[in-house]
C-alpha cells in the first residue's frame, strides 16, 4: 500500500513540474577528487596503523611477560617469607621449651639449695660440740702427718736412685718415658696394650709439681674415677710401679672395650 502511494505521488509530481532545460549534472565542471592520492595516503595510514597495532601488541606482550615475572618473584618472596616464618616459629618453640626446661632446672636447684641450707644449719648446730674434740685430736694428726711426710720423702729419695728397678718395669711393661713439654711433667708411653695392634700406643702425663702426684692427660680416655683410685694407691705407697702397672691395666681394659 505504501508502495502504491509513493508511485502515485511521484507520477503526480512529474505531471505538475514544468519542463526544464539541459541536465544540471551535465553542466557541472569535471573535478578531479584525487582518489589515487587518497588511496596512497590511506595505504600509508593503514601501514602506520598496522605498525602501531603491532607495536602496541608487542608492548602488551612485554608488559604481560613482565607482569608474570613480577608475580613469580612475588610468589617466590612469599614462599621465602613463609619459610622464614616457619623457621622463626620453630626457633620460638625450641626457645620456649628451653625456657621451660631451665625453669624446671631452676626449681630443682632451688630445692637442692634449700636442702643444702638445711643440712648446713644442722652442721652449724653441731660444730661447736665438735670443736673440743677436734682440738684434742689435732696434735695427734699433726704428729702422724709429720711422720708420713718424712716417710714419703724417704721413699721418694730412694725411688730416684732405683734405676735398675725402673729399667726392669720399662722392659716388662713395654714402656718408655718422654718429656711432656713441662719441667714438672713426665709422659709415659705404652705399647702392646691392644691385642689387635701391638704397635698402638697409649700414654698419660704425670704431674710431679706437688707432693701428691696427678694425671692430667691420657690417651685413650679412661674413667677419671679409676685413675683417681690408682693415684690414691700411688700417693699412699709412694711407689711408682703401682702407677705404671695400674695405668697399663686401665689402658688394656679401655682397648678391649
UniProtKB/Swiss-Prot annotation:
Region annotation (Disordered) ranges: 1-23
GO cellular component, one term: nucleus
Protein's cellular compartments: Nucleus; Chromosome, Centromere, Kinetochore
This protein's UniProt keywords: Cell cycle, Cell division, Centromere, Chromosome, Coiled coil, Kinetochore, Mitosis, Nucleus
Coiled-coil region list: 57-143
Bias (Polar residues) ranges: 1-15
Pfam families reported for this sequence: Spindle_Spc25
Disulfide bridge positions per record: none
One of the protein's GO biological processes: chromosome segregation
Family: Belongs to the SPC25 family.
Protein task: Acts as a component of the essential kinetochore-associated NDC80 complex, which is required for chromosome segregation and spindle checkpoint activity.
Subunit comment: Component of the NDC80 complex, which consists of NDC80, NUF2, SPC24 and SPC25.
Stated name of the protein: Probable kinetochore protein SPC25
UniProt organism field: Gibberella zeae (strain ATCC MYA-4620 / CBS 123657 / FGSC 9075 / NRRL 31084 / PH-1) (Wheat head blight fungus)
Amino acid at each position: 500500500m505504501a508502495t502504491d502511494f509513493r508511485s502515485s505521488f511521484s507520477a503526480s509530481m512529474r505531471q505538475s513540474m514544468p519542463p526544464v532545460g539541459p541536465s544540471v549534472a551535465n553542466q557541472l565542471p569535471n573535478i578531479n577528487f584525487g582518489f589515487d592520492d587518497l588511496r596512497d595516503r590511506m595505504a600509508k595510514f593503514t601501514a602506520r596503523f598496522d605498525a602501531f597495532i603491532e607495536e602496541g601488541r608487542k608492548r602488551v606482550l612485554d608488559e604481560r611477560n613482565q607482569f608474570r615475572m613480577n608475580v613469580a618473584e612475588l610468589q617466590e618472596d612469599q614462599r621465602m617469607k613463609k619459610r622464614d616464618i616457619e623457621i622463626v616459629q620453630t626457633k620460638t618453640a625450641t626457645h620456649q621449651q628451653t625456657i621451660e626446661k631451665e625453669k624446671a632446672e631452676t626449681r630443682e636447684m632451688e630445692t637442692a639449695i634449700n636442702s643444702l641450707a638445711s643440712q648446713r644449719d644442722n652442721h652449724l648446730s653441731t660444730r661447736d660440740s665438735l670443736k673440743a674434740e677436734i682440738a684434742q685430736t689435732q696434735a695427734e694428726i699433726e704428729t702422724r702427718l709429720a711422720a708420713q711426710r718424712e716417710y714419703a720423702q724417704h721413699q721418694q729419695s730412694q725411688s730416684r736412685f732405683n734405676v735398675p728397678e725402673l729399667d726392669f718395669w720399662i722392659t716388662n711393661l713395654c714402656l718408655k718415658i718422654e718429656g711432656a713439654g713441662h719441667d714438672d711433667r713426665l709422659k709415659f708411653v705404652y705399647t702392646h696394650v691392644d691385642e689387635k695392634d701391638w704397635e698402638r700406643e697409649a700414654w698419660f702425663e704425670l704431674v710431679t709439681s706437688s707432693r701428691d702426684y696427678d694425671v692430667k692427660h691420657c690417651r685413650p680416655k679412661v674413667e677419671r674415677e679409676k685413675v683417681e683410685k690408682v693415684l690414691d694407691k700411688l700417693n699412699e705407697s709412694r711407689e711408682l710401679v703401682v702407677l705404671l702397672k695400674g695405668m697399663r691395666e686401665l689402658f688394656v681394659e679401655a682397648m678391649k672395650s
